[in-house]
Amino acid sequence: VTEIEPMRSHWWWRPGWRIGRSFYTWHITFAEQAEAARLVDDYAPVLAELPVLDPVPLRWLHLTMQGIGFTDEVSRGDVGRIISAAQKRCADLEPFAVTIGPAHVDPETIQMPVRPVEPLAAVRLAIRNAIGDVWDDVPERAEGWRPHVSLGYSNAAGPAEPVAAALAARGEHVAEVRVDAVSLIDLNRDRQAYEWTEVRSVTLG
């Protein structure tokens, strides 16, 4: 049997983060998608029986695409210019469907892969190029990005086997969702959760 890496808390303060500080980033969100809601419900019993996991409600379900920077380090003028560039570039892309799931255990999360990767990578490239239209240096690496959606975040250290067993007992669940927009959000993690206000939604096509 393959040994699973132990769980650890996701909520350590990464460099630059603190209470009251927020971050501009591009995400795909799913609050209006019935299939995403069903998927959250399908896995809800697993999270309910595991207090070491903080569940992500549908409202805050997201696929992280591309960061810009902390809001106190990025001018509103640059934000506006990046949005305008993103609107132009995303107009050349078409909406598409992706499949989320099934869920698996990760050291800090229960997460679900999102496939196919290619259309998502095209959206991310458009966003990166839009940032590059405004700034000389685009933050974050172009390579190594794995599109995923997290269902819950670990809040403590401990063995991963009980989490994996609970997921296995629940069975594999997936959802097909439509991606027709990408959102620039103002993200915070003040309350041991990722919460945000939307700055602008940019449509594809």
Show which residues each predicted segment covers.
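Histidine-dependent nucleotide/RNA phosphoesterase domain, centered on the 2H-phosphoesterase fold
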Residues: V1-G205
